[in-house]
Every structure is written in C-alpha cells, then in structure tokens.
Design a protein with these regions (language model features):
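Adenine-nucleotide cofactor-binding loop residues
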Residues: 1-2, 105
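Tryptophan-centric aromatic hotspots in well-structured domains and transmembrane helices
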Residues: 4, 21, 67, 78, ...
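A short SAM/SAH-binding and catalytic strip from SAM-dependent methyltransferases
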Residues: 11-26, 48
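Conserved catalytic/acceptor-binding region of the Class I
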Residues: 26, 33, 39-110, 125-128, ...
Length: 172
C-alpha cells in the first residue's frame, strides 16, 4: 500500500485488520484516497488490540525484567491511533465519514485457544523476538496465567474474548 502505483481508480478500497502493521497513517490514508474513483469509498477496520485487557497483559509481561531486552521495540511495529486522529485526517479528504467501535465476541473452547489465536496475530511479534522455544513457551505460559484471570470461563467451559475494533468509512 505504501508503494502501490496505478492509473486505475477504484470504487472501493478496503482493509481488514492490516493497516496497523503499516506506519505513517496520514500518508497511507491519503494514498488510499487517491486510489479512489470520483465517488469512491474507503472502508477500514483496525483491531484495537492494545486497548484490550489481553493486549495490556502481553505488554505488561513484555516489560517484565526477564523479557524486556528481547521484546524491546515490539510496540513500534503497531501503528494504531485514537479515533480523533483518524477523524481529522478523513475529514480533510472525504465528503462524508462514518466511524464506530465494536467488539467481536469470539467464543473459544479454552484459554489455550486464546493463546493459539493470538500467536498468529497480536502475540506473534513478541514471540518472534524471543531467543528460544523455551523462552517462547515460558512467555506464553505467563501470559496465559493472567489471561485466565482476565477472561473467566463461562458455565459451559467456553471463554468469551471480546475483540475491540475500530471501523471507518470515507465517502468521496
């Protein structure tokens, strides 16, 4: 998205849980706007992972003395701003804007399922920086212990994981 060039203009440009990995959102949103046709629409969804209890648990563990040297700089990989940041950019570009936050309620079989799901998303950049498989397993175990406290099991043993998301749509 930061280097994509084309003369073609699109009626719809969308992103689902991707732009948090790309820096410079003001420049990025302007580039995406410029890809739109005269009456085009930009639709973006951003996971607000760092605002969730699970994101806070992972960051707390990462800042622990044992892990800090290995996980230093991970937060720099995430580019997530507050709603007003995005509104101010979009309002300069678009005629009409819709914005909202919501929680996707994931119903998972266990707390281990949370760890499995997060190992390929928000937990992944932390795990990639750890030196050994043993460190990765220890880190995940520490996160799991706190996750169990933050997300209690339901009566049927399932675990509810509300996953916070920001959506915005800009209409040219």
């Amino acid at each position: 998205a930061t280097t994509f060039e084309t003369e073609t203009r699109f009626d719809l440009v969308f992103s689902n849980a991707a732009i948090q990995w790309i820096p410079n959102h003001e420049e990025l949103l302007t580039r995406l706007f410029n890809l739109l046709s005269e009456n085009g629409t930009l639709a973006i969804q951003i996971p607000l992972f760092l605002d969730m209890p699970l994101g806070k648990i992972i960051n707390k563990r990462a800042n622990d003395d044992r892990w800090r040297a290995q996980t230093e700089g991970v937060l720099d990989l995430f580019t997530i701003h507050d709603v007003s940041f995005y509104y101010d950019i979009l309002s300069k570009l678009f005629n009409s804007i819709e914005m909202w936050e919501t929680n996707y309620m994931h119903v998972l079989n266990s707390h281990g399922s949370i760890m499995e799901m997060m190992s390929s998303t928000g937990l992944k950049p932390y795990l990639e920086r750890l030196y050994s498989e043993s460190d990765k397993n220890d880190f995940k175990e520490e996160v799991l212990k706190e996750t169990i406290k933050a997300y209690p099991s339901q009566m049927n043993g399932k675990v509810l994981l509300p996953f916070k998301r920001l959506f915005f749509i800009g209409y040219k």
